[in-house]
Each structure stands twice: as structure tokens, then as C-alpha cells.
């Protein structure tokens, strides 16, 4: 026990995601009722969404902000629809065993919250840089896990408190440049010309994200196959070897690069390798884009 009530608002409103308890907002002292679950889920999105409107307000270009918000909201709602339908539909493997799943796929979920609320949270926490959880992402259905991972790999929807939606802004720069070339005029955005220097920075920032994810995942996969003694000395890493084990490693580096923090927790990641490698990926994925945007 501890000052949980004081930490939860900071965790949620600040898109920080680090819970007082190890199981985060699955814990009844951190998220006791369905009402607190709704408030905490709302708190994740309120400031990242507000930043889009603040952009339009301060630049006096509200229509631009509305269009950006519309694209982000569409992507978010599409993810919510997929995850909620997947989780409330239940697991077909359990159906085949003749076991009723009236409440949906409840593995890794809290009974007081249910499958739909957990699915909603899983999308909300990955479209932002929050990373808090109210259920186990590792136990969600395959398509739900894909949406969670895809949200962080795209790494543009809503963003988070601190840097806002800077990655979406980078995609805007690239899109404006390409569209300017297509119509045969000098690309401009917000009255500023977009030239070779801006495009080089935008390209580096855009390509860095998948680069650090894939390099980290490939290194982990290589060590697991070719250095089994090293992996065993660290505790074995994978509790789910095979296809899902690769997904767990990919999710880990994706989450770090996106400054998210959620995980497929079947991965034993509290080891020297994972702490150091994820720390490096976190620094590169966080600070290089900030420097690029400022430049």
C-alpha cells in the first residue's frame, strides 16, 4: 500500500503509464470500479486530444486542426471496433472445447471490468504514449495484439503530453513535400518552404522508428537462437517460444521505441540484456525525433 491515489492522476493525465503496483490499473487499489476505469481511460486521451485543438487555436487554423483530429479519431475508433469485437467474441479454441464464453475472452482480464472495457483501454493506451494497462495485452486475441502493436509502430495517433503529436507532424511534412512535387510547385506548410534540409530531417526521424525496432528484435532473436547459454543465464526470456515469442520480443522493442511502456508480459524482460537494449532504444526513439523537430 502507498500513495496510489496521488500517483494515478499523474500516471494517466501525464501519459506516463507507470503504475504504483506491478499489475498497473488491473490492481483493485489502483482501479477499483468500472467508474474509475472510465475516468482513467478518459484521462489518457484528454490532453493528447486537446493538443490538436490547441495547435489550431494558436495558429488560427482551426479547420486544419479539425481535419488532423478527424484522421486520428478515425484510426482510433477503427482500432477500438476491432479490439472490442475480438475480445467480446471470445476465443474460438475455448469455444471448440464446449466452454461458454458469455463474457468474451476473459483470459488476462479483470472480472469487475470485463472484456470490452479492457479492449477499449488497450487501444487507448497504445494510440498515446501512455502504456498503462488494465489487463494483460499478452492474453488478448491475435488481431487485438496486432492492433496494439500497429498503433505503436505507426506512432502518430494523438501522441502524448510533452512532445504532443510530433511524429504525425513529420508525416505532414513528407506528405506536403510529395504533393508539392506532384503539382509542380514549391512545397509549403504554414507559410514555410519545405526544402531538402527539412526533408532530410523528416526522413531520418521517420525511418529511425522502424530501424531501432527491427535491429533490436533481430538482435534478440539471433541471441535466442545462437547463444542459448547466454539466454539461459538470464532466465530463459521466453515463456512462449515460437511465433508468439517473436511477437513478444517485437512488441517489447516497439513499445520502447514508441515511448509507450506496455508489454507482452510473457517475456522475461527484467534482465541485463533487455534493460540495456531497451534503454538504448528508448533514448534513440525519444530524443532523436525531438532534436530533429527542433532543428
Regions found by a protein language model. Name each.
Residues 1-295:
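Membrane-proximal intracellular helices of multi-pass ion channels
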Amino acid at each position: 500500500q502507498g500513495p496510489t491515489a496521488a500517483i494515478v492522476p499523474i500516471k494517466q493525465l501525464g501519459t506516463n503509464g507507470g503504475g504504483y503496483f506491478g499489475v498497473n490499473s488491473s490492481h483493485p487499489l489502483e482501479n477499483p470500479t468500472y467508474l474509475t476505469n472510465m475516468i482513467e481511460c478518459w484521462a489518457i486521451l484528454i490532453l493528447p486530444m486537446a493538443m490538436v485543438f490547441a495547435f489550431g487555436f494558436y495558429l488560427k487554423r482551426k479547420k486544419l486542426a479539425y481535419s488532423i483530429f478527424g484522421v486520428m479519431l478515425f484510426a482510433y475508433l477503427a482500432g477500438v471496433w476491432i479490439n472490442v469485437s475480438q475480445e467480446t467474441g471470445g476465443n474460438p479454441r475455448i469455444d471448440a472445447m464446449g466452454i461458454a464464453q458469455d463474457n468474451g475472452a476473459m483470459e488476462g482480464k479483470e472480472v469487475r471490468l470485463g472484456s470490452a472495457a479492457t479492449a477499449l483501454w488497450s487501444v487507448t493506451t497504445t494510440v498515446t504514449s501512455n502504456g498503462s494497462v488494465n489487463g494483460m495485452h499478452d492474453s488478448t486475441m491475435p488481431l487485438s495484439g496486432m492492433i496494439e502493436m500497429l498503433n505503436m509502430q505507426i506512432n502518430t495517433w494523438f501522441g502524448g503530453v510533452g512532445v504532443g503529436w510530433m511524429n504525425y507532424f513529420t508525416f505532414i511534412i513528407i506528405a506536403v513535400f510529395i504533393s508539392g512535387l506532384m503539382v509542380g510547385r514549391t512545397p509549403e506548410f504554414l507559410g514555410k518552404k519545405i526544402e531538402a534540409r527539412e526533408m532530410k530531417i523528416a526522413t531520418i526521424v521517420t525511418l529511425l522508428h522502424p530501424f531501432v525496432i527491427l535491429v533490436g528484435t533481430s538482435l534478440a532473436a539471433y541471441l535466442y537462437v545462437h547463444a542459448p547459454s547466454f539466454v539461459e543465464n538470464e532466465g530463459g526470456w521466453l515463456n512462449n517460444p515460437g511465433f508468439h515469442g517473436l511477437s513478444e520480443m517485437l512488441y517489447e522493442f516497439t513499445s520502447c521505441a514508441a515511448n509507450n511502456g506496455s508489454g507482452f508480459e510473457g517475456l522475461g524482460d527484467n534482465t541485463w540484456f533487455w534493460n540495456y537494449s531497451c534503454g538504448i532504444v528508448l533514448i534513440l526513439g525519444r530524443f532523436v525525433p525531438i532534436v530533429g523537430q527542433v532543428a
